[in-house]
Structure formats: C-alpha cells, structure tokens
Amino acid sequence: MEKFDIIHEFKVLATKLKEDDRLVYLKQARNMNDMDQELQELIRRFNLAQYNYQIEITKDDMDEAKVTELNDELQDTYSQIMENDSMQEYNACKAEVDTLVLYLQNIIAAAVNDGDPMLVPEPVDCNGVCAGCSGCGN
C-alpha cells in the first residue's frame, strides 16, 4: 500500500473516531462547562488572580504578604474549579478519552515495531499518566 493510501485510511478512521461515545461525551461535557456560569466565573476569578500574581512577583518591590494572599486565592479558586460538578464530569470523560488515545498509540507502536497490533491489550483502569503507576507495561 502506498504512503498516501495509508495516511488517507488513517484519516478516515480518525474521522470515525469522533463518533465514539467517549468523544461524544467529552464534547458534551466541554459544552456543559461552557454553559456553567458558576464554573465560568470561577475560571475568570482564577485567571485574574493568576494575572495579579504574575504582576506582583515581577515587581522590584514585591509585597510578600500580597504574593501569599494571591497564591492562597489561586489555590482556593483552583480547588473550587476542580470540585465543580461540570468540571468533574469533564475530567472523568477526558480520562476515558486519554485512555483510548493511549490504547491507539500502543496499537500503532506495536505495528511500527513489527508486533501484532491485534494482540495489544486494552488498558485497564489506566488514566494515561504513568507517574506513580505500578507499571502496566504500556
């Protein structure tokens, strides 16, 4: 098969991938986040605090108390963002998509390394982040 044909077929499969329930749910969760006014306000507060923090730490006469206050505000707002129901749903959906992408990468790697892509096991309870993992071998 020619290189162009392989790329074209891969693009066709990638287009079909967008129909996978995991990607559909991720898109819905992203839209929920966009429509969640409470979450959007928290994100605005976080961005403003981050901006103010960056300005303060670059000042020649930086106010340590102000930096601490802004850092506390950043951490508190970040925690509120991550506790938001819409954000939690999004993160759960994103973790599933990340696991799917990892699986697809492993299939491609098996083929590239002369392995059998059909024998690549599907990740079990994998969040795609290997730090702290006991080692699934993927």
Locate predicted features:
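Amphipathic alpha-helical segments
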Residues: 37-89, 93
